[in-house]
Amino acid sequence: MPASREDSVYLAKLAEQAERYEEMVENMKAVASSGQELSVEERNLLSVAYKNVIGARRASWRIVSSIEQKEEAKGNESQVALIRDYRAKIEAELSKICEDILSVLSDHLITSAQTGESKVFYYKMKGDYHRYLAEFAIAEKRKEAADLSLEAYKAASDVAVTELPPTHPIRLGLALNFSVFYYEILNSPDRACHLAKQAFDDAVADLETLSEDSYKDSTLIMQLLRDNLTLWTDLSEAPAATEEQQQSSQAPAAQPTEGKADQE
């Protein structure tokens, strides 16, 4: 007998506490596939679940890719062949996770979304997971993933500018991740900086709309936007921190920051 919606949500919370994120995904996927709009809590649980399972593998992929480059530079062909096979295994896992959540978004969540907030949230998620595919895909597959990511981010932006205030954490999180997409995937630093600066300036000009409930998340994302702008405009000398890691003097190379953009 399938678990009730209430039980699935409880089990997802339990799995989160136990750091068993694959099981958290399965429980929240069952809730998301019910055809009913998710509550804010359920939406965030779904996002956290997938972010953890994808985040661990994105970090693994970056580490393995870095090792591959070092071994290639040394001319260690036998090790490089082993590393490439291992990287391909990680990429297969990344693809499966991305395709899984993208299917849930397209088949259930986007179609059942009633509020502007939830529409922005889900279109942003769609943009994020196509972007994650574009991070490691090559040739035509990379172009396809990038095009679909751009399309989803634009759809999210169209709703966000009409239905959410500039200080709303979901609108700010969208701007943060969309700007990272322009910088990393489309190699367009000018567009990335323009988008990030516009979002930051609009939020600063509209601070009176900032609710007490979202103050912490909104100001954090505003800081991340400013951090990325500083890094991107500083002659690109200093790469930014990734979503998974803090900036560190020991970190040799990192990525522009993505924020807690999936949280309320």
Curated annotation (Swiss-Prot):
Biased composition range(s): Low complexity: 236-258
SUPFAM superfamilies: 14-3-3 protein
One cellular component (GO) term of this entry: extracellular vesicle
Gene Ontology terms describing biological process: cellular response to heat; cellular response to neutral pH; chlamydospore formation; filamentous growth; filamentous growth of a population of unicellular organisms; filamentous growth of a population of unicellular organisms in response to biotic stimulus; filamentous growth of a population of unicellular organisms in response to heat; filamentous growth of a population of unicellular organisms in response to neutral pH
One Pfam family cited in the UniProt record for this chain: 14-3-3
Spans annotated as Disordered: 236-264
Annotated family: Belongs to the 14-3-3 family.
PANTHER family per record: 14-3-3 PROTEIN (PTHR18860)
Name of the protein this chain belongs to: 14-3-3 protein homolog
